[in-house]
Amino acid sequence: MTSSDLYAGLKELEEQIADYNRAKDVDRARAHALEHTIADLLVQTGIADEMGFRAMHEDGTPFEEVVAAAHTAVTRIADTRIPDGMHIFGEVPEGERRVEFIHAIMRYNGEVRDAVLRMTGHDASTADDALLRDAEAAAKSLIAAILEGEPPDRAAERVLGDRLRRLDLEALQKIQDGVLDLAARIDDSDEIGSLLSGCAGGYIPPGPSGLITRGKPEVLPTGRNFYSLDPFRIPTRAAWRIGTRLAESVIQKYIEEHRAIPENIGMYWMASDVMWADGEQLAQVFSLIGVEPVWTDGRVRSYRVVPLEELGRPRIDVTIRMSGILRDCFYSCIELLDDAIREVAGLDEPPEMNFIRKHALEGSGTARIFGSRPGTYGNGVSLAVYASAWKEEADLAEVFLRWNSYAYGRDNFGEESPETFSAQLATVDLTFNKTVTDEYDLLGCCCYFGAHGGLTGAVRALSNRDVPAYYGDTRDRDRVEVRTLAEEIRRVVRAKLLNPKWIEGMKRHGYKGAGDISRQVGTVYGWEATTQEVDDRIFDDITRTFVLDAEMRQFFADENPWALEEIGRRLLEAHERGLWDADPDVLEGLRAAYLEMEGWIEDRMGDAGGDVQGGAVRVVTVGDVKALRGAREKE
């Protein structure tokens, strides 16, 4: 993982914002001139659309507030970490990549950054974004110096220079020990040796798994027979603290935007919540419904129902679409949650203070955890989207219902419950998922848009309401946030997908890198197909970056022309379906480029040395099948 770095207009925008903040109180004439520059850059970078700049301007919003909103948007991108290419099996990071890797590991608990802040006379709890980013840069330089063998005290003096107020020798020694320990663990990795040993029937030593960038250095060295965790320790106490903050944050955001408390929150619950985040989302659900775990020796033995007077708000109902891996690996977590939901549903409380009971009394029952049929995986929606097997959003909603209406709990394992599932979805006020790391994001797999996007589309279709979609962020345990799905898509697209630094990393991997770029563009299309939360500007910029840029087009032509054809085809489909209101010049260029791509493909097919049999494929939707069956029954 590496820092995303700002690029092109985003970097200039950040610099102009910093200049404005310095000038606004001491040089009003310069500040006024910078206002025009900043406004132009906001439009140029697309940040203006994200923050509603036009509406702010029309409403007479003070420019200082405009700048604050712009700073938040830019910082969200700058603080994102991105993969530096892909991992090659058997290789360990060296040089600058090792520095980046170790910094990414130590960044989670903040010990190096916080030591830098203390030694420069600052406090992490009161530091602003710019100061925190400067401290992280210094932390990375300090790690690099230690890896090169420089004593930590001299390294700190050199890196911090005249900013240094006092050396913290104890902290520096601890940092050195941590850096050298991680370096030794990296060097001890033996992925190829373990693979060969396993193939020969040899013993492979066991080791823990998890997200190394969330403070789990014990995952190293790699090449071990990794195991997961004890599910009866989920959620941990640390995850409970984060989960309760998530619950209150999502409620507060909905209240701010809709002037009402949400009655029912639809959620996508993945196994990664258990394996990577120690059950933060499970803790969030507990907090929403008003129960808390009871631990004994670190294991969750039961739960306590929090009285309403202590809770201070109504109990929020939940409708959960869980992943197949969660179902098959961590069923004890499902049973624990199901027990809590059913007990809360049976409490003798006013329905207006217990929305689970309210909806149960209205006929939805008490099943709240749903997934695909036992023994199967997937959500159905991503398959329909990739096959273009849909005509309108209602088709995708029906696919989602058919695939995911199986209820799970203590006393039922995959009981088909379409009526209950539909009744619950119709009362959902918002949908929710969250990110826990920059190693994996909402463009990384079709399951994200298929499940969360499919859930959102189904809720909107059944409720006939424009239900919002939210995304939580617990990448930094000290800065838990909840934003809209549209904001999260913008963050990931700008920080990663359109970032020249990420693109160059992918290009190092040739055919595979080109294929992964295409796959992530396809995921952007999937989000738009299911939720319509992707800005037109994003599709414009994707087209400019990957299709219209001559250098990128040549890369695809040399390495993987089929990947670019897929990108072009999805973009054209987005336009034809009315999902993308394209810039006319961009659309014209796309169409011309796609004709060129078809020529590439035909040339490559000719190299096969034989005839190629084409064919016609007719894709039908569920509705078409019903109509055909009805017509035959009438015959």
Task: Describe the predicted segments one by one.
Residues 1-635:
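Ligand/cofactor-recognition surfaces for anionic moieties
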